[in-house]
Amino acid sequence: MTLRCAAIGAVVLAGLGCTAQAQDKPVNNGTDPTKLTTILQPTYEYLDLVGGFESGVLRLNYTQPFGEKSDYSLRLRVPVQMNDVLGNSGHDLGDASVMLTHVFGLTRTHGWVFQGEAVFDTAARPELGTGKNVLKGTLIYARFLPTGAIFAPAVVQSNSVSGQARRADVNTTTFDFYYVPKLADPRNLVTVDPAVNFDWENDKEFLSLAVTYGRVTGPALGGVGIVTVKPSLFAGGDRPADWGIEVGFKVLGF
């Protein structure tokens, strides 16, 4: 509980510290999946799990674009998390990952994004990871609507390729329907993210919905700071959780 409160407080205070420097000019707020930029982002997510359990994860993310057109990027993620399903509510290392992103076929009306991610079996305790090394592929089609909104449906496939023999294999598919409305104030952002999730290995399926609310706070660390809050809901008999909430602060373009 102490680490969870400290993490949430640090994330919120980091963003509030930049609010007084807010700017009126439009900035890249990180909602367009075809715009790759340098990102430093800590987030903390709490999930109310089914069965009366709970989990929390502090994710430390760093993204670096590269290539002549900055159409590639590499993201490193280290999670520090807890899950009390086995009675241990302490935080420890989860499964770290690295993700390569490539933007292609970009025009004024649409663009494509491919992401390849490797998730490594680095969790310090069994309940904090899958026990497997997992490869995840994501294909996104981003459509830029005449209203200025973005609709970017995606398909995500995850499969385990190695790991602990006693742990179940990973074979999941997610159909995601990401939408970004155009807001009058460019310093504000909203994303709506409904998804249909299939766990083929365990014969489970469930629905999820996450809505992100954000505010550009102004200059931070040589870039632009953004505070975000993301509540989420889950539905279906196989859902892993009932609801969740994530708070975050990210610096873009530093």
Name these PLM-found stretches:
Residues 1-31:
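Cleavable N-terminal export/targeting peptides
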Residues 22-254:
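Transmembrane beta-barrel domains of Gram-negative outer membranes and organellar outer membranes
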